[in-house]
From Swiss-Prot:
Gene name per UniProt: eno1
Pfam families named among the record's database cross-references: Enolase_C, Enolase_N
Active-site annotation: 209 (proton donor), 340 (proton acceptor)
PROSITE patterns xrefs: ENOLASE
Recorded superkingdom: Bacteria
Cofactor note text: Binds a second Mg(2+) ion via substrate during catalysis.
GO biological processes: glycolytic process
Cofactor: Mg(2+)
MF-aspect GO terms: magnesium ion binding; phosphopyruvate hydratase activity
Assembly and oligomerization: Component of the RNA degradosome, a multiprotein complex involved in RNA processing and mRNA degradation.
Organism of origin: Pseudomonas syringae pv. syringae (strain B728a)
Compartments, record wording: Cytoplasm; Secreted; Cell surface
Residues noted as binding (2R)-2-phosphoglycerate in the record, renumbered to the chain: 167, 340, 369-370, 391
Enzyme nomenclature, EC number: 4.2.1.11
Protein name per Swiss-Prot or TrEMBL: Enolase 1
Length: 428
């Protein structure tokens, strides 16, 4: 049995040019597992704490040397000599050492980087692909499925410097026969969308997640542009390809009202109806954070209104936290959870959230953050848990494409065992 003999933390840069944490876990047989913590832009108020230095003389206060010091000091001391394969013991030891509800002492970014690096080292030690090791940790050994990609091809909200309120307009290649085919479809649509926007005299610069970030007159205009791109690419909207939204509604919820820059002001019930009307007019099969994270009454209205046929995803609402998710399940709020490692801070707690969601009949979507690195762990997480869906941005920027490329490798490795369920992963 291999043992951990060293742990090293360092400050590296994410895709937005901000510092983040990378950790190496070294084993006594020479194996090294490395992982980076991602960082979000639109964040839920109840997420685990991302520890930043606050020193304005370095990186405008966004440095992570405190988190790195916690890795190189107390976390290293705690885990030396431990078995890397026992993920639960490692994660619980770090949680106990931190001693806070939201990992504010050591920093969720420090704990997560070590948690994921240990999992990578353990996978190598057992001569397993990371997704296979994750499946073992998940209690589903040998069970894998390829996720349907939810491709964010128009960026708005906090992910872009434009006037679109809704943060993400996504496409899903639900009619494809494999992940590789679905990725090709999405890429072709992405390039056709660029041509559509150019023909309209619109900007084709991209946002944080690689989607285009044009100034459009309304959210409807974004949907219309995507519909034109899908048709121009030779696919049928509603059968080959469907749509999804991430409203990130907490970002435009002010004083009890939802305020859209071009389309007016709405109460909770009115905005729920606004979203319902969008699903009637467009083949939108998934809506994320359609209402504010604190507007549970509004969420209940939306769930009762369209939850039977539409996937309603809690991101800021649930923040990958089993306590909050259980409350949502009990109250029949939403029907899906977005899974982000760094919202909770360990691999073990991430797996627990996925397991709780699935047991309750909720879907679980594995997700990146807007501040990413070349680390592709979420691709292995999606396959190893058979989550069925993944959000990892658009079809450009290497911080996004690295995850897609890892999924291509995994599908090739699995061969005939690779299952891609397409539309069956969604409601309705």
């Amino acid at each position: 049995m291999a043992k951990i003999v060293d742990i090293k933390g360092r400050e590296v840069l994410d895709s937005r040019g901000n510092p983040t944490v990378e950790a190496d876990v070294l084993l006594d047989n020479g194996i090294i597992g490395s992982a980076c913590a991602p960082s979000g832009a639109s964040t839920g108020s109840r997420e685990a704490l991302e520890l930043r230095d606050g020193d304005k003389s370095r990186y405008m206060g966004k440095g992570v040397l405190k988190a790195v010091a916690n890795i190189n000091g107390p976390i290293r001391d705690l885990l030396l000599g431990k078995d890397p394969v026992d993920q639960k013991a490692l994660d619980h030891a770090m949680i106990e050492l931190d001693g806070t509800e939201n990992k504010a002492s050591l920093g969720a970014n420090a704990i997560l980087a070590v948690s994921l690096a240990a999992a990578k080292a353990a996978a190598q030690d057992q001569d397993l692909p990371l997704y296979a090791h994750i499946a073992n940790l998940n209690g589903t050994p040998g069970v894998y499925s390829m996720p349907v990609p939810m491709m964010n091809i128009i960026n708005g909200g906090e992910h872009a410097d434009n006037n679109i309120d809704i943060q993400e307009f996504m496409i899903q290649p639900v009619g494809a026969k494999s992940f590789a085919e679905g990725l090709r479809w999405g890429t072709e649509i992405f390039h056709h969308l660029k041509a559509v926007l150019k023909a309209r005299g619109l900007n084709t610069a991209v946002g944080d997640e690689g989607g285009f970030a044009p100034n459009l007159a309304s959210n409807k205009e974004a949907l219309d542009a995507i519909a034109e791109a899908v048709a121009n690419a030779g696919y049928t909207l509603g059968t080959d390809v469907t749509l999804a939204l991430d409203c990130a509604a907490s970002e435009f919820y002010k004083n009890g009202k939802y305020k859209l820059s071009e389309e007016g002001e709405y109460s909770s019930a009115e905005f729920a109806e606004y979203l319902a009307e969008l699903t009637r007019k467009h083949p939108i099969i998934s809506i994320e954070d359609g209402l504010d994270e604190s507007d549970w009454d509004g969420w209940k209205i939306l769930t009762d209104k369209i939850g039977e046929k539409t996937q309603l995803v809690g991101d800021d609402l649930f923040v990958t936290n089993t306590k909050i998710l259980k409350e949502g399940i009990d109250k029949k709020i939403a029907n899906s959870i977005l899974i982000k490692f760094n919202q909770i801070g360990t691999l073990t707690e991430t797996l627990e959230a996925i397991q709780m969601a699935k047991a309750a009949g909720y879907t679980a979507i594995i997700s990146h953050r807007s501040g990413e690195t070349e680390d592709s762990t979420i691709a292995d997480l999606a396959v190893g848990t058979s989550a069925g869906q993944i959000k990892t941005g658009s079809l450009c920027r290497s911080d996004r494409v690295s995850k897609y490329n890892q999924l291509l490798r995994i599908e090739e490795q699995l061969g005939s065992k690779a299952v891609y369920r397409g539309r069956a992963e969604f409601r309705g």
